Regions:
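N-terminal membrane-targeting hydrophobic helices
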Residues: 1-221
Length: 221
């Protein structure tokens, strides 16, 4: 995986552009009259976009374009990508928990944001999870804290374009400018890549070097 993290390929650039376009497309759909006229359609589009953003964000980190399909399935890369997408979508379940009902209208009509939308919780929970993973030497899920961070923080950044970041207990920021929101969404995976490059703890020997493609002849951008 170390080679994946140190090479910027056309594949990773394509995934990055796709990530930005999914954000823009999802936001555009949420302005369409046929979507905003229905709470269900609006919720499905919004949550689906969150899921795709999480999925593509971790795909940028893993860069599956460098790996053969067999390695993707055999190793955890594909499942990590899917997990990041699912976790990013699941963040919105706290709307229903806070509303105390599964009725969509009630979940969308909360007077304040539910707990999982407090951005200050993200580093606390992710660091706690990292502590547990390291304390119990759970090597197979050692990247889970990073996956959760990407899924959760990308969800918050996307929401912040409309409502700002909720920095409990201090309050909320102003809504993020649209260009800043898109920039942050695109930058998050590369921040994670940089962090993973600091130490081999995140990568480790999970993939035998013979399964990794040679970087010879890879197109750089």
């Amino acid at each position: 995986m170390d080679k994946i993290l140190t090479v910027l390929t056309r594949g990773r650039l394509f995934l990055t552009v796709t990530l930005a376009m999914i954000c823009i497309l999802g936001d555009f759909l949420l302005t369409c009259a046929t979507i905003i006229s229905s709470n269900l359609r609006r919720a499905l589009i919004d949550n689906g976009t969150h899921g795709l953003v999480g999925l593509l964000s971790w795909a940028v980190v893993v860069n599956p374009t460098l790996l053969p399909l067999g390695t993707l399935v055999r190793e955890p890369f594909l499942w990590e990508i899917l997990l990041c997408g699912v976790l990013s979508s699941l963040v919105d379940l706290d709307h229903f928990a806070a509303a105390g009902t599964v009725k969509l209208q009630n979940a969308l009509s909360l007077k304040s944001r539910p707990p999982c939308h407090a951005t200050t919780l993200i580093p606390v929970i992710c660091l706690f999870l990292l502590l547990i993973v390291r304390l119990f030497k759970l090597q197979r899920i050692r990247r889970l804290p990073l996956i959760l961070f990407v899924a959760w923080f990308s969800h918050h950044i996307r929401d912040a374009a409309r409502r700002g970041l909720w920095l409990w207990p201090w309050g909320s920021t102003s809504p993020l400018p649209y260009w800043l929101y898109i920039t942050l969404i695109v930058v998050i995976p590369y921040l994670v890549i940089s962090l993973m490059n600091v130490t081999n703890y995140w990568t480790g020997p999970s993939v035998d070097s013979k399964h990794l493609p040679s970087v010879t002849g890879v197109q750089h951008v």
